[in-house]
Regions:
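Structural core segment of the AMP-binding/adenylate-forming
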Residues: 5, 83, 110-175
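Conserved AMP-binding/adenylate-forming core of the ANL superfamily
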Residues: 51-106, 123-128, 175-178
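ANL superfamily adenylate-forming
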Residues: 58, 145-195, 304-344
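Conserved AMP-binding/adenylation subdomain of ANL enzymes
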Residues: 222-242, 249-338
Length: 346
């Protein structure tokens, strides 16, 4: 039985609310953090494996090794410390999904700061409410349009001290700022961050009322990541997994799958800011799995259907699509496949 204090007195009054907890299915040590996913991978596999890819043009990618990713994370972390970001301080990332988002996310996690993402489609007024509600002192946007959106509300956000822009080389600016921070100071901050420290505040969409901030610790995310490895190991860990990530990292779902990939032995994340050139990006990156919503897959299907046309190729495409649906239903039901595949020289 729980006891609560009444609003005006000091006496505890009993309630009928009871609280029960049970051990989780996966263990997370008290000193582990989201940053540990990266360092543990490096300890297992070294610095030379590819961990991420950043888009450099339509269908063009630049590979990032674990060593380079780690170097960028530590450099950004030093810059954040030099700026005055302390343990528990809130920093906003107002950006579409991109490589710099991932680097800053791990840098914030390393030093015990709190990532408060703002959805890239949010208005200035929505961003203002989140920034003021969580006490954000530093914001990082991806482009000029979102930078201007925040700049227009800067006077109404008393705690917001500075806005940086990824397209304006925010990572380089932080790296330059961080040269004054010693390795010892950085290591002390990393050592002072623990599993039960706050990692992020994720705000609800606000479709049914004012957005609510949901506080999540490092342990929260690490638990679901490890559960993911147990349940989806063949997808997340086996056969050189490659993830093409385009869902917004402001959502927990995309954050979770990013952490799963970074923490696996040889997973590679391809950060895709938008889906304007999704088909060539799919062909060039060659993902082994995707995280998406129905409209994304509908876009791929409709583009392929239009290209097939209405003649012979169109009929073959329709037959192949029907075959795929039957195959999937049969496999889900645990039965044997009865769908025949046809070839033609026509």
């Amino acid at each position: 039985e729980m006891c609560i204090r009444d609003r005006v007195g000091t006496a505890a009054v009993p309630t009928i609310i009871s609280e029960y907890t049970s051990p989780g299915d996966v263990a997370v040590n008290d000193d582990e953090t989201l940053y540990s996913l990266l360092t543990e991978r490096i300890a297992r596999t070294g610095n030379a494996t590819t961990i991420a890819a950043r888009k450099t043009g339509p269908g063009a990618w630049s590979s990032i090794t674990t060593g380079e990713f780690h170097r960028l994370v530590l450099a950004a972390a030093k810059g954040l410390i030099a700026f005055g970001v302390g343990k528990g301080d809130a920093v906003t990332l107002f950006s579409a999904t991109r490589f710099e988002w991932g680097v800053l996310d791990f840098a914030l996690a390393a030093i015990g700061a709190v990532n408060v993402p703002v959805y890239d489609t949010d208005s200035a007024a929505q961003a203002e409410r989140i920034i003021n509600d969580s006490g954000v002192k530093l914001a990082v946007t991806d482009n000029r349009e979102r930078y201007d959106r925040l700049d227009s509300i800067n006077d109404r956000c008393p705690g917001l001290q500075r806005i940086l822009m990824m397209d304006g080389n925010a990572l380089g600016a932080l790296e330059g700022l961080g040269v004054s921070v010693s390795d010892e100071e950085l290591e002390a901050r990393i050592a002072d961050t623990h599993a039960d420290d706050l990692a992020t505040i994720v705000y609800t969409s606000g479709s049914t009322g004012a957005p609510k901030g949901v506080e999540l610790t490092h342990r929260n995310f690490l638990s679901v990541v490890r559960a993911g490895y147990e349940c989806l190991g063949e997808v997340l860990c086996d056969n050189h997994p490659r993830l093409l990530l385009f869902l917004p990292l402001a959502h927990c779902f995309a954050r979770f799958i990013q952490y799963c990939s970074i923490g696996s032995d040889d997973g590679v994340v391809g950060y895709l800011p938008d889906t304007k050139s999704l088909l060539p990006d799919l062909r060039s990156f060659k993902p082994t799995y995707l995280l998406g919503v129905p409209r994304v897959f509908e876009k791929v299907y409709n583009a392929a259907s239009r290209k097939a046309g209405t003649g012979f190729k169109g009929r073959m495409f329709a037959q192949a699509a029907q075959c795929a649906r039957e195959w999937s239903r049969t496999e889900q039901d645990g039965g044997k496949h009865s769908c025949l595949l046809y070839t033609s020289d026509a």
